């Protein structure tokens, strides 16, 4: 049963339970929230209990070790009804996400770090981080992206500096790239890019070419 949005919490830890769903009117949050924990549960969708338009931005929200994406979708409602997440760091690692959670960015979520390691993504197509024309409101805030331990074979042009001008750290290690994904390399703020251990389904090392001019990026 929900507390209701009249109840405003400063902290919430629901880790290590058997929770399958969190209703939209579960509760509200104060402007002093640092971190919220929903890890190690059975959530199939990203809960719609936040609001990206809030003037208050929480420190972090952790949805790791759930079943998000297992039904083929990341959210249970329509995009018109989804409100995003007003948090700087969003952790979605160890789920069953097959499609990049574009919903978070389309709603203007002010995310600076997104952790999507250990999921089931094979590609991140164009218009996952931006619409066909222009950019979403707050995608430029994204500085750190963790995509390790997926099954990615390519990145789209969404990962260029025109969409992510402040990207500083990105890790695509333990994926399936056979060619170097150069898109993030034109970010003037990029400090670290990890691409270790690229193998195919049989375990063969498949990344063999070093991109020309990478030392001058």
Where are these regions (language model features)?
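Acidic/polar low-complexity surface segments
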Residues: 66-78, 131-135
């Amino acid at each position: 049963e929900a507390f209701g949005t009249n109840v405003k919490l400063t902290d919430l830890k629901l880790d290590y339970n058997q929770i399958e769903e969190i209703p939209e009117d579960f509760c509200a949050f104060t402007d002093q929230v640092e971190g919220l924990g929903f890890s190690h549960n059975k959530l199939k969708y990203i809960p719609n209990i936040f609001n990206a338009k809030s003037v208050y931005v929480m420190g972090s929200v952790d949805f790791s070790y759930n079943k998000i994406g297992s039904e083929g979708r990341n959210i249970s409602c329509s995009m018109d009804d989804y409100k995003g997440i007003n948090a700087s760091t969003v952790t979605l690692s160890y789920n069953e996400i097959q499609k990049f959670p574009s919903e978070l960015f389309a709603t203007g979520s002010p995310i600076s770090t997104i952790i999507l390691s250990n999921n089931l993504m094979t590609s991140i197509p164009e218009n996952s981080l931006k619409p066909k024309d222009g950019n979403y409101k707050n995608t430029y805030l994204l500085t750190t992206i963790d995509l390790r331990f997926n099954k990615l074979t390519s990145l789209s042009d969404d990962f260029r500096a025109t969409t992510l001008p402040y990207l500083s750290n990105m890790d695509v290690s333990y994926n399936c790239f056979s060619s170097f994904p150069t898109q993030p390399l034109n970010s003037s703020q990029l400090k670290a890019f990890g691409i270790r251990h690229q193998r195919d389904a049989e375990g063969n090392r498949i990344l063999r070419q070093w991109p020309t001019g990478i030392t001058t990026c």
